[in-house]
Amino acid sequence: MTSFVRGGFVENRKFRINQFIKVPEVRLVDFDGTMIGVIKTADALAKAQAKDLDLVEISPQANPPVCRIINFSKFKYEMEKKEKEARKKQKIFHIKEVRIRPRISDHDLEVKIKHAREFIDGGDKVQLTALFSGREMQHKDLGIKIMERIKESLADIACPERKVYSMGMRVFLTLVPKNKIK
C-alpha cells in the first residue's frame, strides 16, 4: 500500500482513520454492525479508543460520512485478500502472433498451423497476420483465402474473435480457444 514519491515513500490512504477524519459529524456503525446514529466525530473517536479499535471512514461521499469502529489493520488485511482473490479470478489472455506471406508453400503453411494449434492448446489467443509487400497488395484475396483455410483447419479447437480484416498492407485473423469462450 505504499508508493514511491520523489524524496521517499508515502502511504496511499484509501480510508481516513481516527484523527484524519476532519468532518464535524459522522454516521457511526459499531464493530458488530449495529447503527449507532449521527454523532460528533470527537465522540465517535472517543468510543473507538475506549474499545481499543479504530474509527474508519467507510463512505466519505455520504452526508454525513459513514464511519465504522473496527480494527483497521485487520480490515486492511481483509481488503487486500479480497483484491488478491479478484486478481486471481481474472482471465488473462496472452496474444501470440503467427506471421505468414501470401505466397507461402503448403508445407510451410502446415507448420504455421501447427504452431498456432500449440498456442491455442496452451490457452492463448492467436493473431494470424498475412504480410503483403509491393505488388502483392493487388492480390489481397490470396491472403484472405489463406486465413479462411487456417480458420477451417483450426475450427475444432478455436473460433474467430471477429471476421478476417485488413489494415494497410496486412490481413488479420484472431482466433480464441473454444474452451475459453463463455
From Swiss-Prot:
A molecular function (GO) term: ribosome binding
InterPro entries: T_IF-3_C_sf (IPR036788), T_IF-3_N_sf (IPR036787), Translation_initiation_fac3_CS (IPR019813), Translation_initiation_fac_3 (IPR001288), Translation_initiation_fac_3_C (IPR019815), Translation_initiation_fac_3_N (IPR019814)
Top-rank taxon: Bacteria
Entry keyword Iron-sulfur: no
Chief location: cytoplasm
GO BP terms in the entry: ribosome disassembly
PROSITE patterns: IF3
GO annotation, cellular component aspect: cytosol; membrane
Keywords on record: Cytoplasm, Initiation factor, Protein biosynthesis
Subcellular location: Cytoplasm
SUPFAM superfamilies: Translation initiation factor IF3, C-terminal domain, Translation initiation factor IF3, N-terminal domain
UniProt function note: IF-3 binds to the 30S ribosomal subunit and shifts the equilibrium between 70S ribosomes and their 50S and 30S subunits in favor of the free subunits, thus enhancing the availability of 30S subunits on which protein synthesis initiation begins.
Quaternary organization: Monomer.
Similarity comment: family membership: Belongs to the IF-3 family.
Protein name: Translation initiation factor IF-3
Organism: Endomicrobium trichonymphae
